[in-house]
From Swiss-Prot:
Stored SUPFAM superfamilies: Release factor
Bias (Basic and acidic residues) ranges: 280-291
Superkingdom of the organism of origin: Bacteria
Annotated protein name in UniProt: Peptide chain release factor 1
One annotated GO molecular function: translation release factor activity, codon specific
Record keywords, A-Z: Cytoplasm, Methylation, Protein biosynthesis
Region of interest (Disordered), residue spans: 280-303
Modification sites for N5-methylglutamine: 231
InterPro entries: PCRF (IPR005139), Pep_chain_release_fac_I (IPR000352), Pep_chain_release_fac_I_sf (IPR045853), Prokaryotic/Mito_RF (IPR050057), RF-1 (IPR004373)
Key word Protein biosynthesis present: yes
NCBIfam families reported in the protein's UniProt record: prfA, PRK00591.1
Subcellular location: Cytoplasm
Described function: Peptide chain release factor 1 directs the termination of translation in response to the peptide chain termination codons UAG and UAA.
Organism: Campylobacter jejuni (strain RM1221)
Lineage: Bacteria, Pseudomonadati, Campylobacterota, Epsilonproteobacteria, Campylobacterales
């Protein structure tokens, strides 16, 4: 019974209330912070649980009044409303009971690379960057470019952006994978549709405590920054290339104004990549069914097609097709795709948890 599953949450919440008012905890900032965070995380399920249990009590009270000559009709109407509310609350509670992704509230690094298709792929990276920037603005996220390499005719060969905002990972994690684009290039005189592809990697930002890097495992090179076409953009050795020797991961950053700033940014990206590698290894050890709930997020997995001649965008993980590609790209309306993906993910998780 669902009500019995809620009891531990209610008891723990009351326990936390008592602990947070005790002098021992008040005088211990570290414990106070930890327990306050736990209480905040429990609050949504506790509030919904109390509403649900109150609804169950009200249902029983109104059932007892059905044969009352004065209150029977009123109880019947009230009971109808409560019986409709009960399953809605149950579904909301089941969603809240699902295991939380520990990365969901983090900022993210969004790494986009041009793949097959040459210049067309680079141009689409540029278009997608603009669309993601609008999406970030819509949701109140802050977006900053960490590093970039421009394409020869525009757009980007590759770009790394930091997206800051509560829940950024919880939504944009669904963007990881291969994005295929079909459109007629401006240089195409015959009107033929060309197909190109880009890859998106979504990496949660991590702190120093979570990822420790031995300085002896790093090779740090400094060089002149180069701009569009390879020309030097300044006369100082400000660009930084960091190689993590054990894994072979290489990060280059030249967008900052100083060597120190570029090294700091490159280290953040390196930590995110190492964390992503660890997470991928962990996921690989779990069951394939769980890994493929909405798609693995592997950058080699083709997740979406953007067909410009048909104004069509298709997400292959959930067989979703929308004929409003122009609006989605122009206004950054990715929630029209992300929301169905979240719903699908939750349905799969509910089935797995037998809720």
């Amino acid at each position: 019974m669902l009500a019995s599953k809620l009891d531990p949450f209610l008891k723990r919440f009351e326990e936390l209330n008592s602990l947070l008012s005790s002098s021992d905890i008040i005088n211990d900032i570290s414990k106070m912070t930890t327990l306050s965070k736990e209480q905040k995380n429990l609050e949504p399920i506790v509030l919904k649980a109390k509403e649900y249990l109150k609804t169950l009590d009200n249902i029983e009270e109104n059932k007892a009044l059905l044969n009352d000559p004065e209150l029977g009709e009123l109880a019947k109407e009230e009971l109808k409303t409560l019986e409709e509310l009960k399953p809605k609350l149950e579904e909301e509670i089941k969603i809240l009971l699902l295991p939380k992704d520990p990365n969901d509230e983090r900022n993210i690094f969004l790494e986009i690379r041009a793949g097959a298709g040459g210049d067309e792929a680079s141009l689409f990276v540029g278009d997608l960057v603009k669309a993601y920037a609008r999406y970030a603005e819509n949701r109140g996220y802050k977006l900053e470019i960490v590093s970039s390499s421009e394409g020869s005719v525009g757009g980007f060969k590759e770009i790394i952006m930091l997206v800051k905002g509560t829940g950024a990972y919880s939504r944009l994690k669904y963007e990881g994978g291969t994005h295929r684009v079909q459109r007629v290039p401006q240089t195409e005189s015959q009107g033929r549709v060309h197909t190109s592809a880009i890859t998106v990697a979504v990496m949660p930002e991590v702190d120093d405590i979570e990822i420790e890097i031995n300085p002896n495992d790093l090779k740090v090179d400094v060089m002149r920054s180069s701009g569009h076409g390879g020309q030097s953009v300044n006369t100082t050795d400000s660009a930084v290339r960091i190689t993590h020797i054990p894994t072979g991961i290489v990060v280059v950053n030249q967008d900052g104004k100083s060597q120190h700033k570029n090294k700091e940014s490159a280290m953040k990206v390196l930590k995110a990549r190492l964390y992503e590698m660890q997470e991928s290894e962990r996921l690989a050890k779990e069951s394939e069914a769980r890994k493929s709930q909405v798609g693995s997020g592997d950058r080699s997995e083709r997740i979406r097609t953007y067909n410009f001649p048909q104004n069509r965008i298709s997400d292959h993980r959930i067989n979703l097709t929308l004929y409003r590609l122009d609006a989605i790209m122009q206004d950054g309306l990715f929630d029209e795709i992300i929301e169905p993906l979240i719903t699908h993910h939750q349905a799969q998780a509910l089935q797995e948890q037998n809720l």
